[in-house]
Amino acid sequence: ETGIRQADFTPVFENQIKQAIDEFAGDDISYAVRSSATAEDLPDASFAGQQETFLNVKGHSNILIKIKEVFASLYNDRAIAYRVHKGFDHSKIALSACVQRMIRSDLGSSGVMFSIDTETGFEGVVLITSGYGLGETIVQGSINPDEFYVSKKLLKDNKPAIISRSLGSKKIKMQFTGSSSDHDQAVQVVEVEEGQQRKFSIDDRHLLELARQALIIEEHYGKPMDMEWAYDGLEKKIYIVQARPETVQARLSGQTMERYQINTHGKLLISGAAIGHRIGSGQCKVVTSAQDMHMINEGDVLVTVMTDPDWEPIMKKASAIVTDSGGRTCHAAIIARELGVPAIVGCEKATEVLTDNQLVTVSCAEGEQGNVYEGELDYKLLETDIGDLPELPVRIMMNVGNPARAMSFAGIPNDGVGLARLEFIINNKIGIHPKALLAFDLLDNELKEKVSALTYAYPSPTEFYRQKIIEGISTIASVFDPKPVIVRCSDFKSNEYANLLGGELYEPHEENPMIGLRGTSRYLAEQFQDCFAMECQALKYVRDEMGLTNVWIMAPFVRTLQE
């Protein structure tokens, strides 16, 4: 590494670089200098973040310096450790430096996208993450980004194709400074104003444009792809700045279903986004600096703010990883998937809640939400060879309440969904009584503020309600299409509705809610008809506009002929 840094380029090489820059756009604009190695992204290795990237580099001499730094990074500690772990021959690795014009995403947004679901390997969607400013914050895992799923089939059919939107906190962004000679001074991290945090960092039009590009790139390479993108805030254009093969789900056979099952539940300490589907337990080691990495022993649970490529040698020692920040496409998530280590990212306060030597169990086996429990809990691994399952003389449909589990369930032999309940969507994705959304202008200021915090990114409170139901139903329906998906309309009891935000204002106290105002009788009740109308509008949109006519509708708890 030092030898490369101290060596001189030949005058011929230097002149060729200068000439290329002048022909391209001149040296008065800024460039990104990035690595592209032959061993990067082999079928079972992502090499995520192993070599250097430099942003906002200006001038011939600075570009040449950074090219040399990229070459030298082939032999930094983390790259050597990664190759040793993967069994690659150091002499068989070749590397080039890629010089790209800098996209002004510091004035726009940027992110990562996969043409496959990173957690389940379901190939029918494009997963897109997005944040403000330069994409480094997402790749490094220093923000919790916005996250979207786009259905490939609906996109190809020219139907509304965005089936899921999750708002990330996006508290910071990276932008350029005036300096361009030193990488550390060429960019700076600033806070994102609160109003922007509460909005999505990319609009639907650009999301769909990105998803179309993902399909083109996937078709070109003939395999699932991992891509980085940037939206130029000056040009108002989207650029794809990197594409490489996805390295984890694409190599799984899909014939053996591995399922971890937690048998007991302890006290829930903290939650975040689950990476993978495994469970791990051990003693916490709270590490806030790379200097303290030596504290991690085999089998410890690594707890940190975020990881970067320097952490890779110790990540494989950990039984599990828990971070304060980051999304499903950050460095920690990619490496954890590759190593088969359960990880929970974006917990916000893990380094405050968890303490050194505290015994915990980290579970990624309960859906999209990963949970950290107190103590060492009992769990088991169940393995099923799907290829060996017998043909059955009956149709087997499954229950899917949580849309986030639909993609993993779709891999199990099935004949569709016999019951998709709206209660999970209303409880977990909405959390607000529908009447409070309809009567938003009449709410007191305190309740208004709480409702606004949840609905701010949507055109109106009622549109938030409709949209979340549309997203939940369309996720399940598009994943199982063309098999039937029977959606049961809401069947909360009055005491359950009262637990939603604002619910106590609208719900009666009933001695026996089990046979009270629920199901179809509630839909017909004058005080609830406008609430039920929003459900109907959502169902109609999914069937008529999105074309998901595999959705069947079930009316629950029908007690009379009139109902």
Question: What are these regions, as identified by a protein language model?
Answer:
Residues 125-226, 231-232, 272-281, 304, ...:
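Conserved catalytic alpha/beta cores of large enzymes that bind or transform nucleotide phosphates
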Residues 1-98, 194-205, 210-212, 218-222, ...:
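N-terminal beta-alpha lobe that positions the nucleotide/phosphoryl donor
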Residues 234-235, 248-250, 269-273, 278-301, ...:
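Acidic, glycine-rich flexible loop/linker segments
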Residues 21, 37-47, 92, 106, ...:
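Conserved alpha/beta-domain cores
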Residues 256-306, 501-518, 522, 527-540:
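Non-catalytic terminal/interface segments that mediate subunit docking, oligomerization
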Residues 1-9, 162-180, 347-377, 451-461:
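A structural-propensity feature for long, helix-poor, extended segments
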Residues 49, 222-247:
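Conserved metal-phosphate-binding beta-hairpin within the catalytic cores
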Residues 47-81, 105-179, 241-273, 317-324, ...:
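Extended active-site and interfacial segments that coordinate phosphate-rich ligands
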